[in-house]
């Protein structure tokens, strides 16, 4: 990737996904389907030159329900110019995070899917085909983006794109409010929201509380973007003592969650969070009826397309500064996986299509994300991140690949999974009795108990 300094950070970055792992949710009941071994190196495939005569009918399970009958059909048409005998049928799943886990246990769910985080790393080979050695793939793709579904040096998921975690905002609203510089600290952000409330008719910060999954965006800010620590999830969260406590320097998880708390407490969000409307919010932000929303970079193009004011939509990093420098967490979005039980021709055809999607389709850029291909340019929508240091996934130590997920599950805090913490913040601040400190103490107690249950002595 160009124009950015890239660090490594811990491996968690998807939005609203299930808390329990596949094995914990019944993976042991997987239907016995014969696994098909394929002796093809994905990295060596030359798209449009190799396997152009292959015949296959592929079923592709996707969470992108809005694209099944539109953009994905265009992709199929373009791909078939190179591979005319490969037919692809997309199936959009509305409740993807939950349904895909159940579907995987049958073994015959289709040929390509977006790999859920519910699959433990040591179980990946039971469900998915290896794309090959990570070192070979890292010659073409950003190595750090391959870590999420890599195990024992084999890669089982190719990222569809990478996301940066930040804030989508309306530049015209910010200008009308007299905000001439983007906020770089939580205090500056709250002050900017107050200016929007005082000088415009826009809702300063729209939580999208009712959608549920949107609340996980706040979880995505707490690691590298809020700390500048390249190993924060593995050390500061998984093995750290009381990770939600106030650091007293405007950084870390507390700084993120307290920003949401203060925004809601001071009336800088919508009047009734239970009435928020995700689909409608995109048009509202486009029209300047909303000042900003906490969402990944993937949301930029959706908001731009939701009205006539695409040029008014901008993206900024979350307002935290660490020792004078700003960071932004970045990591892979959903990753493409291939059913290891599909036939050899189906697996090879699936590899060709996935490689075309990753390298030729322009999908990542069109969705406001980052391409994982080394050297690809950043989309124009993310130009404001110039000079911000991106922090990317670092895997856990060998033997600890599932440790964070186990602690996260046992604590029931659902970081990057259920949005339990930011959801509680909104609920308690609007209609509850707990103070922020009450909630912080509760989170620390739950996390400590989960650490101890998994043999971790906090450092």
Walk through the language-model features, giving the residues of each:
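Short, low-complexity disordered leader/linker segments with a strong preference
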Residues: 1-58, 81, 445-459
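Hinge/lid segment of periplasmic solute-binding proteins
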Residues: 34-50, 116-166, 172, 190, ...
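Short, solvent-exposed loop/beta-turn-alpha elements that line the ligand-binding surface or hinge
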Residues: 50, 132-143, 225-255, 305-308, ...
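Extracytoplasmic/periplasmic substrate-recognition and gating elements
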Residues: 77, 81-82, 87, 177, ...
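Extracytoplasmic "Venus flytrap"/periplasmic binding protein-like
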Residues: 78-144, 156, 172-184, 284, ...
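Periplasmic solute-binding protein
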Residues: 123-127, 145-182, 208-239, 330-340, ...
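C-terminal capping/gating helix-and-loop segments adjacent to ligand/active sites or protein-protein/ligand interfaces
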Residues: 150, 367, 376-377, 390-452
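Glycine-centered hinge/linker elements that transmit conformational signals in sensory
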Residues: 193, 238-273
